[in-house]
Design a protein with these regions (language model features):
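Intrinsically disordered, charged and Pro/Gly-enriched terminal/linker segments
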Residues: 1-127
């Protein structure tokens, strides 16, 4: 059912009119519902051991909201569960650079802790 609901989402409400103030609240509400749906999908897939599908959903969510660190943390967990801590480390490094360059942000303490727990002292080069 998650997949069915997700397939109906076609992007932000009236995305061709991003500055239309009259629909901004509804656009934000529908966007949040979509992100909550993606969070539920990722969680269910991960619980079922479908880590590739969970990874796909997390990437979709991060494309829609790159600052939503809960999706990054879930993505890192799923990549490690797929046996690809090297991909997780590379994705984390890229995400940190992008977040800093575009928004001037650093990852939260919680995200750094998850990364360190999952990846430890492993670098992108030594996988």
């Amino acid at each position: 059912r998650f997949e069915e609901a997700e397939s109906l989402y076609r992007g932000d409400y009236l995305e061709d009119e991003p500055y239309a103030e009259w629909c901004a609240e509804e656009r934000a509400r529908l966007r949040e519902i979509h992100l909550e749906l993606l969070a539920g999908m990722a969680k269910c897939y991960a619980e079922e051991g479908l880590f590739m599908e969970a990874t796909r959903v997390c990437r979709t969510a991060l494309a829609n909201d790159p600052c939503r660190e809960s999706f990054l943390r879930a993505l890192l967990e799923n990549l490690v569960n797929l046996g690809r801590p090297d991909w997780a480390a590379a994705h984390y490094a890229t995400w940190c650079r992008s977040l800093n360059a575009e928004y001037g942000f650093q990852p939260t303490h919680e995200t750094v802790q998850v990364y360190e727990r999952l990846i430890g002292g492993r670098s992108v080069e030594n996988g």
